[in-house]
């Protein structure tokens, strides 16, 4: 086992139970503000294993950009039939309440979620905190010379270098909030155990 695995200590401090959250959106932040959520995926981790995965499809108020459509494959026509964010918030909040929320690239997903909660006049439940798996993996990824941008190693990079099953490849290769939340949970648990090639 590499001595660089000591750089993964922060992952070993994660509780046995937590929630992984991921979103797919209408695009990137721009001069008009933050993008809208199109899908929100939650993976429930209990006793270091995946207990449940669920996806909420939410009707955006903004149009989905061509680039975003190419990433997640959801068209504006499809999204128009989704339920509103506020009509699903109580169910989403029920998963988040009193939990540690793990997000890969939390600096993207978390502000967007908070923006939606405020915009729709909802209330965020009390949570334990937010853990960004991308930022936490930076020291290890850099020491191991793995590709690592300024935000940290991508989920694709960690999936590949850790030998985690690529759930995206099982489908059409596109991103999806449910798939990516589950994939993040598998990557995080692999880093917790330091079990990889």
Model-identified regions with their sequence ranges:
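Metal-dependent phosphoesterase core characteristic of DEDDh/y 3'-5' exonuclease domains
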Residues: 5-17, 32-40, 44-74, 93-197
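Metal-dependent phosphoesterase signature
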Residues: 70-90
